[in-house]
Structure formats: C-alpha cells, structure tokens
Amino acid sequence: MRIIIDGDACPVIDLAESIAHKFNIELILFCDYNHDIKLNYGRVVKVDQSYQSVDMKIINFAKRKDIIITDDYGLASLALSKKASAINSKGKIYTDKNIDTLLMKRHINKKIRRAGGRHPTVKKRSKKNDEKFKINLIRLIKDIK
C-alpha cells in the first residue's frame, strides 16, 4: 500500500503526510514542474506541464491497494478500475457505487457552462473537511491493511 497524492492543487498535503508517516506508509506526491512542493516525509515526482500529464503518470504508477488522493473524478474512476482506493480532499471516499453519479454530474455541469449557464460552486473548505479527510483516510488505511 502506498499513498499517492495528485498534488497540483491539493489542500491536504500536510495532513496526508503526517498520517502516512504515522502509519509508516510510502507517500508519493505527483505535481508538474510549476509547483515547488517539499515534503518532510515521502517523495515528490515532478512531471511535464502538459494537459493531464500528472493524472496519466499517477494512473500508470498506481496499483492495487494504493490510496489516491485527488479531487479529479476522472482520475478517481481510473484508480478504482485498477482496484486502488480514492479519496478527495474533503474526505469523500470514491467507490464503484458513487463514481458514475459524480462523473454524470460533472458532465451535466460542463454542458450547463458551455450553454452559458451557471451551477452551484464548491463551498469554501472548513475544519470539518480536514477532520473528515483525516478520519476517512485512516479508515481506508485500516481497511486495506
């Protein structure tokens, strides 16, 4: 088991790093060359800035029982297809039961935007999000071990 972070815009890097260290789990953060991210525990893998390059590198690197931290539904879906687990930065665990609905919502929202419409925006992060993330990441780790 490894924890893999889609690090380009991840607000829970520090939390994930401390939990990985606590459980002695390998931590790998992927980001493009425009980000200067340093970790005290784990390693950073930098990739080209091209479209989807971080996601493609992560999915090619991921394997069964890994935990992927991402807010990208497409990447989460691919992770699940590889029998890895996926969780977002607010602590929502992606599953085979909820990923199709999330992908459909994303598709519908994209169509609304293209037609000039608007849809509800993402709410500001809260301490509750951090707490839920911590609880659910630890739950995933314990379930996999």
Predicted region positions:
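Nuclease catalytic cores that cleave nucleic-acid phosphodiester bonds
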Residues: R2-K145
